[in-house]
């Protein structure tokens, strides 16, 4: 089947720099552009017809607008308490998933690596307070229906572009 779908809001300066991943009948794709003031997310589309199955935002949006109606809504309730002020949602928040997406078949978990904040300066973005979940985190999702499972944040309050967007490798190692 051949289909085409626009995966980003074209009124904002999103970019797409990573390849999609295909798992379990789904095409998974993130986006880039945190440095340009966008809000990050990863989306799953039906591999047969391109219909969006779910979306997981990586940073909270404007609280006055309420939940997004996305798979990430429960996780965003948790994340919202780690952000302060209102600059982050006015300036995008960042947290794009522009490359690091990998699927663990054994655990049936999708791992996404989340990028930098927007604006980059923690003091401007969140009054210099809070961990700013899920910036610079590896987030594990259930690939059906995109439900949050767990996360590890490598750089709380990320300001230095120490992101988790490098390729994620899964390996079984014997360590003595």
Predicted regions and their residues:
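Asp-box/WD-like beta-propeller blade repeats and closely related beta-sheet repeat scaffolds
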Residues: 1-43, 47-48, 52-88, 97-98
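Conserved short loop/turn motifs at secondary-structure junctions
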Residues: 33, 127, 154-157
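Short, small-residue-rich loop/turn micro-motifs
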Residues: 56, 60, 114-117, 142
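Short Pro/Gly-enriched beta-strand edge/turn motifs at strand-loop
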Residues: 80-86, 119-124, 151
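Gly/Pro-rich turn-and-neighbor structural signature
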Residues: 146-152
């Amino acid at each position: 089947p051949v289909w085409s779908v626009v995966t980003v809001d074209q009124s904002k300066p999103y970019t797409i720099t990573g390849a999609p991943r295909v798992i379990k009948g789904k095409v998974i794709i993130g986006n880039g552009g945190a440095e340009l003031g966008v809000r990050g997310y990863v989306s799953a589309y039906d591999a047969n017809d391109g219909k969006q199955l779910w979306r997981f935002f990586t940073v909270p949006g404007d609280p006055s607008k309420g939940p997004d109606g996305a798979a990430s809504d429960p996780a965003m309730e948790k994340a919202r308490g780690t952000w302060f002020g209102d600059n982050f949602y006015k300036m995008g928040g960042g947290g794009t998933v522009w490359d690091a997406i990998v699927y663990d078949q054994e655990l049936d978990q999708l791992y996404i690596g989340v990028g930098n904040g927007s604006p980059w300066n923690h003091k401007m973005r969140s009054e210099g307070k809070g961990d700013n979940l899920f910036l610079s985190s590896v987030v594990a999702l259930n690939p059906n229906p995109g439900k949050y499972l767990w996360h590890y944040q490598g750089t709380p309050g990320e300001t230095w572009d120490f992101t988790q967007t490098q390729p994620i490798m899964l390996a079984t190692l014997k360590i003595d």
